[in-house]
Amino acid sequence: MFDIGFSELLLVLVIGLVVLGPERLPVAVRTVSGWIRTLRSLAATVQNELAQELKLQELQDSLKKVEQAGLQNLTPELKASMDELKEAAEALKRSYHVDAGSEAPHTIHNPLVTEPEAIHDGVTPAEPATQVSALAQAPNILEAGTASVVDSVVEAAPVTTVKSVVQGEVLVKSTPVQEVGLADVMDKPVTKQQIDTIDSHGTDLSSAGPSRIHQPGGDQ
C-alpha cells in the first residue's frame, strides 16, 4: 500500500526500538498495524462503491442506446399510429381552448339580452298563462262559496223532529224561490228578527197535525 521495502521497514523498527524501548515497542507496533488495517478497509470500500457506480452508469448508457435503436427501428405502422395519436391530442387541446373562449361572461362587450324586442315571436310570456289558470279556477271558487253559505244557513235552522223536517220541505216546495246572488248573501248579515221568524215557523210546524200521505193502497 505504502510501497515500503524490507530494508526501510527494518530501519523503522530499529528507530522505534531506540526511541520507545523494548517495553513500549510491541504496543506501538499493534496500534500502527490497526491503523493500517482500517485504512485498507476504507480504501477497499471506496473502491467497491466507485466500481458499482461506474457499472450503473454503463448500464444506463447501454439502456439509452438500446431505446434509441428501438425507436429508430420501429415499423412504419407503429410510427403512423403514434403520429395519429399525437394529432388527436393536439386537436382535443385546440377544441377545448376554443370552447373556453366562446363561453365568455356577460360583460360590456357581451351583455345579457333582457329587452322585450329581443325576444322571439314564438316565445310567449308566463303572465297570460297564470291569468288563464286563475280564471279557470274562479267558477270552482264561486261554487265552493255558495255551498259553504247554504251549509251554514241549514245548520243555523233548528230541527226538532223528523216530522217538522218533512213538513218544512213541503212548505219550501210550495213557496216560490227567488234567485239570490252570492254577493247579496255575503253582504247581508242574518238579523235576530230573521232567526226569531225561523224559530216561530219551526214551532208552528211541530204543533200542527201529521200530514196525510196518500199511497196506492188507501188512506193512512
Swiss-Prot record:
What is the recorded membrane topology of this protein? Single-pass membrane protein
Molecular function per GO: protein transmembrane transporter activity
Region (Disordered) location: 192-220
Which InterPro entries does this UniProt record tie to the protein? Answer: TatB (IPR018448)
Transmembrane stretches, by residue range? Answer: 1-21
A GO BP entry is: protein transport by the Tat complex
Write the record's keywords in alphabetical order, separated by commas: Cell inner membrane, Cell membrane, Membrane, Protein transport, Translocation, Transmembrane, Transmembrane helix, Transport
Where does the record say this protein resides?
Cell inner membrane
Alphabetical GO CC annotations of the entry are: TAT protein transport complex
Which protein family is it in?
Belongs to the TatB family.
Listed under subunit, the entry gives: The Tat system comprises two distinct complexes: a TatABC complex, containing multiple copies of TatA, TatB and TatC subunits, and a separate TatA complex, containing only TatA subunits. Substrates initially bind to the TatABC complex, which probably triggers association of the separate TatA complex to form the active translocon.
Q: Which HAMAP family match?
A: TatB
Role noted for this protein: Part of the twin-arginine translocation (Tat) system that transports large folded proteins containing a characteristic twin-arginine motif in their signal peptide across membranes. Together with TatC, TatB is part of a receptor directly interacting with Tat signal peptides. TatB may form an oligomeric binding site that transiently accommodates folded Tat precursor proteins before their translocation.
Q: Name the NCBIfam families on file.
A: tatB
Q: What is this protein called?
A: Sec-independent protein translocase protein TatB
Organism of origin: Yersinia pestis
The root-end lineage is: Bacteria, Pseudomonadati, Pseudomonadota, Gammaproteobacteria, Enterobacterales
Gene name per UniProt: tatB
